[in-house]
Amino acid sequence: MKKIKKIIQIGMIGGLAAVAGGALAGCGSNNDNADTLNQAANAQGAFVIIEETAPGQYKIKDQYPSDETRVVLKDLNGTERILSKEEMDALIKEEAAKIDNGTSNLTKDNGQISSGGLSLGETLLASAAGAILGSWIGSKLFNNQNFANQQRGAFSNQSAYQRSVNSFNKAGTTSSASSAKKSGFFGGGSKATSSSSSFGS
């Protein structure tokens, strides 16, 4: 009986050590995870769900690799619709101007954000879809620590962020050959759909 207790104790200590090690590794890999999301979008498109959490404030609910880039917007009333490519291009262009004049929350640290959240354009640009569609403004955000932090915070919760990192990481390893021919913002391509039909109807 004592041997069984000893084995259980050793197993528990080993398990706790493994969990603690993983947590510490996760703390130090904030930028690595952001790079994974941004670089993995190279090889494919992205399906992104953005939800309005308060008037004018948005979060990324989920995103994962897809053959085409598509963004679903869910408003406060629960209505879902697919953003057209024209809408997304306009939002990204508007956000690029804000980055240029220093008013974008994406390039501010957390203490400087006064609105309490990200706008639709900021949230879109923080997503994998933004990495693909906003390829022309990559140099404005490349290696920006504040952007890396805001990108992580753009998700509805930590598990959604980690799930996204994992899905793009997995997809990136299986399609690394095709990513070699892409270039641009975070190495992103420019695949996108222009569908404006309703989602889930």
Swiss-Prot record:
A lipid is attached at residue 27 (S-diacylglycerol cysteine). It is a lipid-anchor. A lipid is attached at residue 27 (N-palmitoyl cysteine). Residues 1-26 form the signal peptide. Its main location: membrane. Disulfide bonds: none annotated. The keyword Lipid metabolism does not apply. Residues 169-201 are annotated as: Disordered. Residues 170-184, 191-201 have a biased composition (Low complexity). It is found in: Cell membrane. Keywords: Cell membrane, Lipoprotein, Membrane, Palmitate, Signal. One of its GO terms (cellular component) is plasma membrane. InterPro entries: UPF0323 (IPR020913). NCBIfam families: PRK04081.1 (NF003146). Belongs to the UPF0323 family. This is UPF0323 lipoprotein Cj0371. It comes from Campylobacter jejuni subsp. jejuni serotype O:2 (strain ATCC 700819 / NCTC 11168).
